[in-house]
């Protein structure tokens, strides 16, 4: 699954949807952490209550101190981590869009954050302030493939989302399309 999905392409408007936390890996970890946390919590409670709360095991025979309390502690931590994953999926943290509009000569970058006053992060730049587009390609154990917008006085602003790096051809094509649309140079390829 790509980090950037083209949504609108026209002569005057280019818009990409950026996938935030709603990636398959986050769904996997949300399910795994919730299930594991619930299992450990029930095992710890079973040892405390001396009553089997798990149908596939007999944790009631565990001694509460130290085994049961450790299971309960790790179960609560796992459940809280699972809850965080589910909330990040619900809130779609990091999701948003990149919009390039020739009519207004504006670039709008929108990302979703945590609930509150500043839930939506919105950055706007003029076409005239864009110096170039930079592509970062790093292979190896922790690969990185990202597109950055180089803006005067602002440095490099990432346009790609987090997660699994998109295929090399896809990142090159997207960077070339954006650079042509903005009429700026492309660095790093």
UniProtKB/Swiss-Prot annotation:
Disulfide bridge partners, by residue number: none
Predominant place of localization: membrane
Gene Ontology CC entries for this record: photosystem I; plasma membrane-derived thylakoid membrane
Keywords linked to the UniProt accession: Membrane, Photosynthesis, Thylakoid, Transmembrane, Transmembrane helix
Subcellular location field: Cellular thylakoid membrane
ATP-binding listed as a keyword: no
Pfam families (alphabetical): Ycf4 (PF02392)
InterPro entries to which the protein is assigned, alphabetical: PSI_Ycf4_assembly
Bilayer-crossing regions: 25-45, 62-82
Function, as annotated: Seems to be required for the assembly of the photosystem I complex.
Protein name (database record): Photosystem I assembly protein Ycf4
Species this chain originates from: Synechococcus sp. (strain JA-2-3B'a(2-13))
Lineage: Bacteria, Bacillati, Cyanobacteriota, Cyanophyceae, Synechococcales
Gene behind the chain: ycf4
């Amino acid at each position: 699954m790509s980090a950037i999905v083209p949504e609108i392409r026209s002569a005057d408007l280019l818009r990409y949807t950026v996938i935030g936390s709603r990636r398959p890996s986050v769904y996997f970890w949300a399910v795994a952490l919730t299930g594991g946390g619930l299992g450990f919590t029930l095992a710890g409670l079973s040892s405390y209550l001396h009553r089997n709360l798990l149908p596939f095991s007999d944790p009631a025979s565990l001694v509460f101190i130290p085994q049961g309390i450790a299971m309960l502690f790790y179960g609560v931590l796992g459940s809280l981590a699972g809850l965080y994953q589910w909330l990040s999926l619900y809130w779609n943290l990091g999701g948003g869009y990149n919009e390039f509009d020739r009519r207004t000569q504006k670039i709008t970058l929108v990302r979703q954050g945590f609930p509150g006053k500043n839930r939506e992060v919105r950055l706007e730049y003029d076409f005239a302030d864009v110096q170039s587009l930079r592509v970062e390609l790093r292979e190896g154990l922790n690969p990185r493939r990202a597109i950055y917008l180089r803006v005067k006085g602002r440095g490099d602003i990432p346009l790609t989302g987090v997660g699994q790096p998109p295929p090399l051809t896809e990142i090159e094509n997207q960077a070339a399309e954006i650079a042509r649309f903005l009429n700026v140079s492309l660095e790093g390829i």
